[in-house]
A protein has these predicted regions:
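A conserved beta-strand element that flanks and buttresses the S-adenosyl-L-methionine
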Residues: 117
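Class I (Rossmann-like) S-adenosyl-L-methionine-dependent methyltransferase catalytic domain
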Residues: 2-111, 125-206, 218
Length: 277
């Protein structure tokens, strides 16, 4: 394979707690629909188990949680990194014991959920975090648990939000999840019509999904070579490295020993692979 250099998709904005808190303090929340997105509302109406454990990451003003409570759901958790927002939510839901409001980083969150709702969280993350997103979602879902919601099927001139495509999502989530649905949403709000994919991804509990920190790769050709070598391991089903070559997920039928992975890349002394726990 060619070892030529290639562009790396980066995000120049520091999309940290300060950035997002400033958006809420300035009321600069252009992504806020002011209501539940219709495709998500339609799906919620099909969930019979009102005691199902439901997580909403990057929850924002969490109209989804409000609707869930109205429909009688009793085990809802929402998490966001912005203190100003979270304090407001705690005041709004102060007298409701059916919702837990968490201030924190989604990737540090622990728990098990039957459903996780995706609503403008994936697109708010720098693209370099997409592999980590897949790993964490798989980790947080119960066996047969489902990730459902909306992903953009378009690009944006100014980000965030960060766009994506059907082909990218299929490559990213394959084998870690079973695709019950991934198609153009039929009832998006007018301003997002024909740009949103509705997804229902069921956790594939039969497969192992592991995330690794990787050091030493500097070009797409090198990345392709390493990925190909990992694909040759018996039982490996999918390999996906992020756009700055720093993280990689490996989906496999059984756990792959870290020493095996390190030995495979030992042909270049710069390469180091470390499992994320």
């Amino acid at each position: 394979m060619s070892e030529e250099k290639c562009c790396v998709v980066t995000c120049d904005l520091p999309l940290d707690q300060t950035y997002w808190d400033n958006q809420y303090q300035a009321n600069a929340t252009g992504w806020d629909l002011g209501k539940v997105s219709p495709p998500i509302k339609t799906y919620i109406n099909t969930i019979d188990n009102k005691e199902a454990k439901i997580l909403i990451p990057g929850c924002g003003n969490t109209y989804e949680a409000e609707y869930l409570l109205e429909q009688g759901f009793t085990n809802i958790t929402v998490i966001d990194i912005a203190p100003t927002l979270v304090e407001s939510l705690k005041q709004n839901f102060a007298n409701n014991n059916n919702i837990t409001i968490v201030l924190g980083d989604f990737f540090d969150h622990q728990g098990k959920y039957d459903f996780i709702i995706e609503q403008t969280f994936f697109c708010a993350l720098p693209p370099t975090m997409r592999q980590k997103y897949v790993w964490k979602m798989h980790q947080l879902l119960t066996d047969y648990g489902k990730l459902f919601g909306l992903l953009f099927n378009r690009e944006f001139e100014v980000s965030p939000p960060f766009g994506g495509s059907l082909n990218e999502y299929e490559q990213l989530f394959t084998k870690a999840f079973i695709f019950n649905s991934i198609s153009m949403a039929g009832n998006s709000i007018p301003s997002r019509a024909n740009t949103e994919l509705f997804i229902e991804f069921q956790k594939n509990e039969l497969n192992q999904v592991n995330l690794y920190h990787f050091e030493g790769i500097t070009c797409c050709g090198c990345m392709n070579t390493v990925s190909s070598k990992f694909f040759e391991i018996n039982g490996v089903l999918n390999v996906s490295m992020n756009s700055n070559f720093s993280e990689i997920i490996i989906v496999s039928k059984t756990e792959i020993d870290i020493n095996t992975l390190q030995e495979i890349v030992s042909y270049d002394e710069k390469y180091k692979i470390i499992k994320t726990n």
